[in-house]
C-alpha cells in the first residue's frame, strides 16, 4: 500500500526488485 513513486502504465515496475507491484497503474509496496 505504500507508493513506490513509479507508474506501470507502459512498462512493468522496476521497483518490483524491492517488492513493489502494479496496482491501478502505479507501483505500490504493501
Swiss-Prot record:
This is a cyclic peptide. There is a cross-link at residues 1-30 (Cyclopeptide (Gly-Asn)). Signal peptide: none annotated. GO terms for biological process: defense response. PROSITE patterns: CYCLOTIDE (PS51052), CYCLOTIDE_BRACELET (PS60008). Disulfide bonds join 4-20, 8-22, 13-27. InterPro entries: Cyclotide, Cyclotide_bracelet_CS, Cyclotide_sf. The presence of a 'disulfide through disulfide knot' structurally defines this protein as a knottin. Probably participates in a plant defense mechanism. This is Cyclotide mden-E. It comes from Melicytus dentatus (Tree violet).
